Amino acid sequence: MGALKRMAPAISRRKLVYLSVVGALAATATLVVPTAADARITKVTITTKESPTFGGYSWPGVGQYEKILGTAYGELDPNDPHNAVIVDIKLAPRNAAGKVEYSHNFYLLKPIDLAKGNHKVVYDAVNRGSKTFSVLNRGLNGDDPGSVTDAQTLANTFLFPKGYSYAASGWDASAGTDPANFNLIINLPVAKNLDGTTITGPAYEYIVTSGASAGLTYAAATLNKSQAKLTHRVHLDDVPQVVPDAGWDYNADGTSIHLVGSNFVNNDIYEFSYVAKNPTVNGIGFAAVRDFMEWIRYEAEDDFKLANPMAGDVNRIYTITRSQPARMLNDFRTLGFNASEGNRKVFDAIFNWVGAADGINMNYRFSNPGTTQRNRQDQLYPEAFFPFANESTTDHISGMTAGRYDKCTATITCPLGMEVYSSNEYWVKAASLFHTDTQGTADLPGHPLARLYLISSHQHSNPGNVNSKGSCQQFGNPLASEPVQRALWEAMDKWSTQGIEPPPSMVPRLADGTLVPPLPQSAAGFPNIPGVTYTGLKSTRYRFNYGPNFYATGIMTTYPPVVSSPMFDNLANGPIYPSLVPKTDVDGNEIAGIRLPDVRVPIRTYSGWSLRSGVWANDGCEGSGQSVAFPATKANRVASGDPRLSVEERYPTFLDYYFKVAKAINDMVAERFMLPEDAGAAMNRMLNAGFATGAIKMEPEDVDE
């Protein structure tokens, strides 16, 4: 296995070109002077300081860490152009200085001796209040990572041995208002009409629960049921059946609904439309992230002389995300929030996991950032709108020209972007729009400050269980992206600090035939596997009609939008942005993207999509993928009629399998998609998976004595 120690090839000369660009941007950015009108953190309170944390564990060369918990209080100038994009900010209450106030809690981990750290901060843009950095950090997880004391876990972790500081803070209204159990929350103002009266408007809930009641994001403005409607259906494409008024009711304060005499049926689809009141100004969450990171990076103290615990130390801030916060940071860039009111850069690089081309249901009146569209759920919430790509494109529907990097380009505050995502995003979130024009007819060249990486055949987020089907038709997809993420993180850091470019984008393309429609099945490449249903089910990205002024104001007057069955590929539901999916090889594994060792030396078919089972059969199984084992032997294959070669036909001996796995891992290290330190664990995992097939067996002669 000595070959696993090979180093990556020399870096491309293109880094010299990028260095000149970086130098120019940096030189220009240092000339910007913040104005007196800057939005800012005015007050910070520290509620907990644990020094040392991690049970006193000390990393060689870095030392011990401390944990700091507290609350940050901020204010925004509603008239500043940087904040004017926040929907309803001019209708939020103001203090005596004419500013809009908010607060959020935070969680910091930092070296006690900052001089021993690497002067870089990892900002965890939390998912619905919970921390996400476990996807990168090798087993160190939970919402209070500082409480971990196991020496082996801490020694093996990824970020802290390198001296990173860590920060997380609340930004998401859907995380609630309870900070218990280290939940990170934000307290937001409620918008009022200019005359001080209560704002009301249409609101919508998609309900999938087995409970007796379903909470509402916003309280009902009236308990008069004639101004509300509850519907029920089993399949996405069933005609919704109206639940009679006598069949449901509000609770006393209009904050939840319940069925009369029964519970909601788990996994059935209920939709509730009603008139709501008191919208929170959720778009302030963008500014809260911006201003807290600006304070951490640039300020010495708050207005009350409380010292910034990171003062004078921060040279770089990178983000880490998973899913929902990645979508938030997509809109964060689009709306220009990487520049403070004084045009100071906030993030040097954004590392997004499973965000792809999507946005977030946040900067709209009566929005709910906790929702997420997939291939069955939450289809009608406002989530993903043009622009989808980082570079500027023209929307063939609206005629607008824009890109996610346009605003930061104008202020010279663009972050580097590492966009890492799964196959699932193509099937349920139209990820192809990240790198095609809006008509799906031409590949985009890619923005020079961003890279796009598909993890081939991967499901959304965490690995699935190969021994469980859950609510899906097939067993879970076990592919794990974490080693690739760590390698790309290192590449991102070198890009930011040294100008060494990361590997080129790895996505399916129209030009090479690896980006295709899901139907017909033969053109998509997916084989006819016995017992596996393939329907080509893929979500459709529409430009929905939320009312005449929605796309200019963020205020919905038609909510939910009017749609009809079928849900997908139906022009009656609105203009369509065509999207495509990755083509597969003869085994059903995707051709383009970063192919993990499991895909390069397969024993299964791995898919980023899956279908539901039971009474909901053939509806989408949301973020779940699937895996279908190859036949173990040729006899099994012939008997079942499976077109895929069996395991024994592919790998006639243990050593054949062993050396193919070793080559796959070596290649990933050479390509900079795996760190040498992760190679051994990958080898062991692959060997164990091979043994589990029963067709790969180590013989006595395979043992090196």
Predicted regions located by residue number:
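N-terminal secretory signal peptides that target proteins for export/translocation
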Residues: 1-13
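C-terminal segment of classical bacterial N-terminal signal peptides
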Residues: 27-36
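C-terminal His-loop and adjacent cap/lid subdomain of alpha/beta-hydrolase
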Residues: 38-705
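N-terminal export leaders
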Residues: 16-17, 289
